Amino acid sequence: MRKLNVSNLACYRSGNKIFSDISFNLNEGDVCLLSGSNGSGKTTLLRVLAGLIPISYGSIEYNNMNTLEDNFYILGHRLGIKEEVTPYEDLLFWSSIYNYKNFENVLKRVGLKNYKSLKCKYLSQGQKQRLAISRLLVSKKSIWLLDEPLSSLDKEGISLLKELIDEHNKFGGIAVISSHNDFLKKYDFHINMDK
């Protein structure tokens, strides 16, 4: 059984405390919701979990290893979408990295099938967010780290994202999600970064 154990995690930057004493244990199928005001450390916590920012104190273990290694995908604020490529080309690139074969079905699933040949610079922000979300699916990673994933999504896009998270968890995936919006009616662990 997959397990993510975070114990007494702390992060200091330039001597300033960003957060401290963060602990939680997630099993396969679990969702952890991070809430809090802007600047409370939600993004930093996700980046620490991903290994992009060093841990000041504490530990992160996934399946008894001291790292998430190659088991996670982080969806952050910067989507990294190249304006001159098409959604088809973008997902073809990511699919080749993750050895995912049926990426055209993923474009259809996220509602971008009819836009697959349009350069990304002509997509709306919501469509770009859907393209970024499609990378989660082709990554096949067991842990999703989602930083404000509702950004620019309309009601239909939010509903799609909830459905994808539910499916991910149903098949044993773990999700750690920061959000100002209470779009998740059900979660297994909640961390209020303001406390």
In which residue ranges do the predicted regions lie?
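Helix-to-loop junction immediately C-terminal to a conserved catalytic motif
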Residues: 50
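Q-loop/switch helix immediately C-terminal to the Walker
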Residues: 78, 83-102
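Hydrophobic anchor residue at the start of the ABC signature
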Residues: 133, 172
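Catalytic Walker B motif of ABC-type/P-loop ATPase nucleotide-binding domains
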Residues: 144-148
